[in-house]
Amino acid sequence: MDSGRDFLTLHGLQDDEDLQALLKGSQLLKVKSSSWRRERFYKLQEDCKTIWQESRKVMRTPESQLFSIEDIQEVRMGHRTEGLEKFARDVPEDRCFSIVFKDQRNTLDLIAPSPADAQHWVLGLHKIIHHSGSMDQRQKLQHWIHSCLRKADKNKDNKMSFKELQNFLKELNIQVDDSYARKIFRECDHSQTDSLEDEEIEAFYKMLTQRVEIDRTFAEAAGSGETLSVDQLVTFLQHQQREEAAGPALALSLIERYEPSETAKAQRQMTKDGFLMYLLSADGSAFSLAHRRVYQDMGQPLSHYLVSSSHNTYLLEDQLAGPSSTEAYIRALCKGCRCLELDCWDGPNQEPIIYHGYTFTSKILFCDVLRAIRDYAFKASPYPVILSLENHCTLEQQRVMARHLHAILGPMLLNRPLDGVTNSLPSPEQLKGKILLKGKKLGGLLPPGGEGGPEATVVSDEDEAAEMEDEAVRSRVQHKPKEDKLRLAQELSDMVIYCKSVHFGGFSSPGTPGQAFYEMASFSENRALRLLQESGNGFVRHNVGHLSRIYPAGWRTDSSNYSPVEMWNGGCQIVALNFQTPGPEMDVYQGRFQDNGACGYVLKPAFLRDPNGTFNPRALAQGPWWARKRLNIRVISGQQLPKVNKNKNSIVDPKVTVEIHGVSRDVASRQTAVITNNGFNPWWDTEFAFEVVVPDLALIRFLVEDYDASSKNDFIGQSTIPLNSLKQGYRHVHLMSKNGDQHPSATLFVKISLQD
């Protein structure tokens, strides 16, 4: 039952010095402010999955003193968070480290007694995170179940009494009536000692993890045999999985990759265990493995791509009084975001600051944000990052901004047009590793050659902070001075190359040329929706050659989001959402940008790139986009669904909703029945049929909720997949958490077919 020892042995880490130090534990200084440093004991638990932290809170619970390795986003050495940068400058960097979590919770800033202790923690955690990520689905399942067994073994005798068995089933999120639990217990208790140990626990584990639906699927493919031959596997891949590359080569590679039995592998066969390993793997996922890498043409103009974009990136919470943080930029970049917003204002000591103007959100230094962007811009993707500047600074502080941009970003910053690219927007491929500024600019694309002098007066049209239309909102923000003119420093203007901010003056027409290719307008969600309603095709055609940025309405002071789908349907590229706010809008957003290797750029369909096209998302007619498909999805079962209530006795009642997002004609939703008291292996076996007419714009969202008859259902997990990335056949859908991180073991088992 020692899952930790199994983990260390599996990865050859049983004698690792760093991990032994973590298992022993150590006293560390926890830092919260300049006046709050407290010594606390931290220790890696034996399961190698959780960290125990000493707490002196009066209302502490055992659960509150633990955090999971799976919740860690990153471990940073030195003064590399706002907390340590502000409050631990007196301590050498080699003793400082930070644990950054995936969700919105605070970073854990720590000081070790010595550089060696800090190294043990940083290297040890890196090793566990790396090796946990490399575990296959079966290993994760085993590790998780063994961890639950260890928790249930209250007296730590490596045996399981009937009472401990009941606790174990609750840990697994399954409610079994006592008579059935007693029946399983007796079947496995071969020694008749009224407790399970060693092989008896293994027998119980096998009985628990047996999946009837996998047995049935395997029997369909193997007939009466105990294994699949290469020919049988090829037939399954062709007829059920609809794999384009189905053939002996693919079958043999799957056997080599997933078959655990060396005997079967040598005989070029796949056992049921190997079959399950394949179905749980990336090859058996409902999301196309080929689309997990960059596969699209990256050589087209920027305006031909959807761009993952964040609104008011600096905010961690609401738009009126929440905190601003450099961590928000890091989180967005790590999620593949390629367009960030910087709302710049004059700060004290001649240092520009970033915050949501006219509100009470906290303030951060412009230079600190640039350093965070420099360090993280290209960790998740090599393709260009666009910094959307909302500039409210005086000339003097604009020049400080320009100096910081030059000094901190250096050669990353694009500060002149690319050679030979002066008539159209460059491509993501041409701009790899580059950071572009979007903002006000004096003159045209090329340097003005002295025209206009060192500064000029231009109209500021993107003052989103002043767009607080609602009276209730206006009463809660600071008074906006009456000023609609901005004096722009030449030094800052010259750094804006291909993304010059302009007022939208209407679509181009004969005799009215409209915007230059390097000029772009921003639209509130409401204005964009009006343009789509009044001139859908005009907006689509405008977006073939020009970038358009969409941002949330001013009344969304709670940082809520609008649906990005309608904007994408109109060809809008920079559809900015509040990344800090989880919900269905961000689920769909993350699903769209999971495509093309999650690089932050997704090529628009051909009909949204045609300057003479006739597509209108609000008045759908026949055209090259019309490709009627019949989509059948059978939701068969769920696996290891997480608890939503921290109450240990609470078991989920899961239901699944399958949603279609796309053009209005394709939008649809279907629901399964509710399965009571079973989050471990619920069974639905329910089929849904959908008709989709514009598949290139459709996304499929699988939503799993805990049903509640008296209030709103609780979110359990979801996965959103572009229809063009959806694989056919028997597949596992790997569920994501509320914050967009993948659950380690939670899946749906489905069968998918897509026909013309």
UniProtKB/Swiss-Prot annotation:
InterPro entries: C2_dom, C2_domain_sf, EF-hand-dom_pair, EF_Hand_1_Ca_BS, EF_hand_dom, PH-like_dom_sf, PH_domain, PI-PLC_fam. The active site is at H311, H356. Keywords: Calcium, Disease variant, Glycoprotein, Hydrolase, Lipid degradation, Lipid metabolism, Metal-binding, Phosphoprotein, Repeat, Transducer. Strongly expressed in lung, liver and heart. Also expressed at least in pancreas, kidney, skeletal muscle, placenta and brain. The modification Phosphoserine is found at S460. Substrate binds at K438, K440, S522, R549. It is linked to Nail disorder, non-syndromic congenital, 3: A nail disorder characterized by a white appearance of the nail plate (true leukonychia), the nail bed (pseudoleukonychia), or neither (apparent leukonychia). Leukonychia may involve all of the nail (leukonychia totalis) or only part of the nail (leukonychia partialis), or can appear as one or more transverse bands (leukonychia striata) or white spots (leukonychia punctata). This is 1-phosphatidylinositol 4,5-bisphosphate phosphodiesterase delta-1. It comes from Homo sapiens (Human).
